[in-house]
């Protein structure tokens, strides 16, 4: 593009200006089977009470996941499979670094969370505790509510973790 929008003009996961930018859910409904967008966080693939009332079981194919970017200084792809009052479940994909390791922007959640290392190893920095843990493929990690953390990729290729978070 000729002009790259600034952080203030961009909607992204936990973006500080998301509430001031237009909600695209209604605008995109006219597209029919529209792709999920950042505005769908907390409502994807549908409202939890709607799913419970219908007794619905909903499959989410790989191409239907809600893709959003976490962070602007150290961006990481987040692919949500579900995000509603049931909880939040998906994948975090952190690309390889450039001149050094790649770190995600720090994050913390209102509810408990867990990580499962699919492709690693993944280093989990607990910023406020000044501790680090290395997850090998198949390892899991519990994050109590309010724990500040970031993921670090020391590898030459992308790393991937599956996450479950009760409250973003």
Give, region by region, the residue ranges found by the protein language model:
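Non-cytosolic beta-sheet module surface loops
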Residues: 82, 105-107, 153
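A generic fold-level signal
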Residues: 84-86, 109, 156
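Conserved GNAT-family N-acetyltransferase fold
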Residues: 92, 115, 141
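A short beta-strand-loop-beta hairpin characteristic of the jelly-roll/cupin
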Residues: 101-104, 108-137
């Amino acid at each position: 593009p000729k002009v790259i929008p600034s952080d203030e003009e961009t909607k992204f996961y936990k973006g500080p200006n998301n509430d001031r930018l237009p909600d695209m859910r209604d605008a995109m409904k006219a597209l029919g089977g529209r792709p999920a967008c950042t505005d769908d966080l907390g409502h994807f693939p549908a409202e939890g009470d709607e799913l419970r009332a219908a007794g619905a079981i909903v499959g989410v194919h790989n191409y239907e996941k809600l893709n959003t970017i976490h962070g602007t200084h150290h961006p990481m792809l987040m692919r949500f499979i579900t995000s509603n009052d049931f909880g939040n479940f998906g994948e975090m994909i952190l690309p390889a670094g450039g001149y050094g390791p790649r770190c995600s922007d720090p994050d913390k959640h209102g509810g408990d969370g867990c990580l499962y290392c699919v492709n690693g190893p993944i280093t989990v920095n607990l910023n406020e505790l000044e501790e680090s843990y290395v997850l090998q493929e198949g390892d899991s990690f519990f994050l109590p509510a309010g724990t500040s953390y970031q993921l670090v990729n020391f590898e030459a290729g992308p790393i991937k973790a599956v996450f479950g978070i009760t409250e973003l």
